[in-house]
Structures are given as structure tokens and as C-alpha cells.
């Protein structure tokens, strides 16, 4: 039995990861996983999308693969009041745009920053963007590469943000950006929806499967679409309130208790 969260490392890629840790992990999994899979009687993964990818890429019969969704921690929920002491450790005021950054190309950081520059050109509000988990050197390189260095004054990039502060920041933000190029599931997507934060996410891979109607989807390869969605949320109060309501409703369909129950059934079904 093997739990396999994704097979991204077996798919073609355009760029090497700038992180040595990520690059070594990519090569290790690419070498080891196909060998292990040959001996597995059952494979568990985290979405129907990933089931199909595994079956197709590795020529494994679909009935040997089971999709069991992830859950999320229950402290992610709408808060009656936002703790501004936590918020102001990262950004002066609430009502910002929030993005969990990463140097992994699939996280689409370059296009998110390009989309944000397009948003700033058209928005009357010009909300600042809080970026987690990225160093200034990397951000500067992307801004120079995209020719948008002038937007830096609107960015906040405190580096690492502990998990214990994320629920407060989701609640304090105007919208959460999660337009990845590829996700096998996407737990941050659930976390933000559970907090009642409107989400802009990708229309590819497992993201629409997880989001349902609880998030707005875009083609993540098109920065102008990402910017358009942000502006729609800003300019259409009805749409904004609908998304705030849809998110928690959708997130309630996922839980770690449900995940554990389904895992238990699969393990019990295997005869030794």
C-alpha cells in the first residue's frame, strides 16, 4: 500500500527549481517512486485528477488507485474579530490581497506578480499584496525580469508566516490568490475558503475539483485573467458576498475525520 500525493516529478517541466532541496527531492522521487509502485497492491492519492494522472502516466489499472480527499485544521474558520496585533506583524491594515509564495515554478509566482501589476493599473483601491515565504532577493529578481519594479512599494514580504497566524491573516485579507499551475489537491485553498475569504484559483488540475463553487477560477497562465477576477471582486459587492458565503459551505464537505475513516476502510479491505 502506498499513499502518493502527486507525480509532478514524473511530468515534463520547463524550468529547474531554484531550491537545491526541491531539486534533489525531484530527482529522488523520480527514481524511487516508479520502482515502489510495481510492488503496490493499492495506491491512495488525494484527488480524482491525480488518480487519472497516475493511472495514465504509470500504466496502472484505475481500480488499484483510490482518491481520498485531504481535510483541514478546524481553527480555520470565520472569526468574529480579527486580532490586529497579529496582522500588524506583517502588514499595517486589513483588506489586503494575500498570496502564499513559493519558488517552485508550479506556484506561478511570476504571473501572480504580473497580474498584481495589471490590477494596480486599473484599481481605484490599490490594495497591498502580502506575500508569505519568499525572500526579497527572489522578489526583486522577478520584478526586474517582468519589468514591474515600480510595484514593490505595494508589496509586503515578511518571509515565513507560522501556521498559527494564517487563520487570522485569511480573515483579515480581502481575497486570497492561489492560481497555481498544478496542484494535486491544495490545502491552502480549503483553509482560505473555510475562513470565508474569497479565493481566486486556477482552473487546472485538482483545483476546480476541490473548490467547486467556493472559489473563482482563472486560466493561471494568463495574468490578465487573474487581475480581472480581483477587479470583479472589488467592483461587484454581490459577487464578493456570494464568495464569502460559498467558501465555508464548500469547505465543510472536507475533514480529517472523513479522511481517516476512508483510509481505514481501504486498509481493512486489503487481505494480507
Stretch-by-stretch model annotation:
Residues 1-272:
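Carbohydrate transferase catalytic cores enriched for Leloir-type hexosyltransferases
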Amino acid at each position: 500500500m502506498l499513499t502518493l500525493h502527486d507525480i509532478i516529478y514524473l511530468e515534463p517541466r520547463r524550468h529547474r527549481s531554484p531550491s537545491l532541496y526541491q531539486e534533489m527531492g525531484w530527482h529522488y522521487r523520480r527514481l524511487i517512486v516508479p520502482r515502489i509502485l510495481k510492488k503496490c497492491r493499492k495506491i491512495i492519492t488525494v484527488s480524482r485528477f491525480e488518480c487519472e494522472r497516475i493511472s495514465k502516466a504509470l500504466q496502472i489499472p484505475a481500480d488499484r488507485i483510490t482518491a481520498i480527499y485531504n481535510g483541514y485544521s478546524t481553527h480555520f474558520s470565520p472569526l468574529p474579530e480579527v486580532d490586529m496585533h497579529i496582522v500588524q506583524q506583517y502588514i499595517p491594515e486589513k483588506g489586503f490581497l494575500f498570496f502564499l509564495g513559493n519558488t517552485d515554478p508550479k506556484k506561478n509566482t511570476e504571473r501572480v506578480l504580473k497580474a498584481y501589476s495589471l490590477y494596480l493599473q486599473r484599481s481605484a483601491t490599490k490594495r497591498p499584496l502580502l506575500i508569505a515565504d519568499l525572500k526579497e532577493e527572489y522578489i526583486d529578481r522577478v520584478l526586474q525580469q517582468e519589468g514591474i519594479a515600480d510595484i514593490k512599494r505595494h508589496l509586503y514580504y515578511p518571509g515565513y508566516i507560522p501556521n498559527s497566524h494564517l487563520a487570522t491573516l485569511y480573515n483579515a485579507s480581502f481575497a486570497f490568490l492561489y492560481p497555481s499551475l498544478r496542484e494535486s489537491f491544495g490545502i491552502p485553498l480549503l483553509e482560505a475558503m473555510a475562513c470565508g475569504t474569497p479565493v481566486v484559483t486556477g482552473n487546472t488540475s485538482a483545483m476546480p475539483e476541490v473548490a467547486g463553487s467556493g472559489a473563482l477560477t482563472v486560466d493561471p497562465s494568463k495574468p490578465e485573467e487573474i487581475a480581472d477576477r480581483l477587479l470583479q471582486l472589488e467592483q461587484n459587492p454581490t459577487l464578493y458576498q456570494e464568495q464569502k458565503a460559498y467558501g465555508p459551505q464548500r469547505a465543510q464537505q472536507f475533514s480529517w475525520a472523513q479522511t481517516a475513516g476512508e483510509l481505514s476502510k481501504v486498509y481493512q479491505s486489503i487481505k494480507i
